[in-house]
Amino acid sequence: MFKKRVVKGSRDSKRKRLADEAVASDPVLPKDTGKTAVAEAQVEVENEDKRALYLAKEREEQEQELELRRKERTVLEQEIDEDIERKAKAKVSGFVKPVSKNMKTVTITDYQPDICKDFQKTGYCGYGDSCKFLHSRDDVAGGWKLNTDWKVDETQEKEVLKELEEIPFRCFLCKKEYTSPVVTKCNHYFCSSCFMKQMKVSTNCPICGKETEGAAKMATKLRKLLKKT
């Protein structure tokens, strides 16, 4: 009985078989029609646009920040200059020094001793609160007028006092203040009711004893003097 002889393949046949297996195991790739390159180019352009917009926005924000810092620096420099100038003006020599911040100050405006004629006549002044004259609408008079009025009043007051000195300040009969005073021919003053009662007793004047005949007239002068006092 004879055995079957197995013939081994050559190296070339083995290499071919491995190549066929590799081709069979790989998937079939689609053919490139050129659209892939166009899409990639479009995506790249969009990315470039976004990058440019971002850089422009970032550059604009940086410029705005620089401008803001420049303005803040300018304002700060102005405040420093004003503070230095204010301190220089407030600095005085001698015993009087600038007032501390925790102290309360009161400002008194010393007006020129004249009255604003426009405000006195019309109630309006174009200078407003900066006017150096006093805004007042009270009745005023010049110095010479005041002195004249004072002299007149003083003279009249002296005359009244002199006349009152000559007249008793109370009724001679009732020892009280005059009520409806009357005067006799001998220039003696009494209350009307007191004089009428005395005339029932005697017609002679109670002070000097002269005959009055029971007649007396109203003392208008004394009444005016009593009203002034």
Swiss-Prot record:
PANTHER family: RING FINGER PROTEIN 113B (PTHR12930:SF0), ZINC FINGER PROTEIN 183 (PTHR12930). Residues 1-43 are annotated as: Disordered. Associated with the spliceosome. A zinc finger (RING-type) spans 171-209. GO terms for molecular function: DNA binding; zinc ion binding. Involved in pre-mRNA splicing. It comes from the Eukaryota. The lineage of its organism: Eukaryota, Fungi, Dikarya, Ascomycota, Saccharomycotina. It is found in: Nucleus. This is Pre-mRNA-splicing factor CWC24. CDD domains: RING-HC_RNF113A_B.
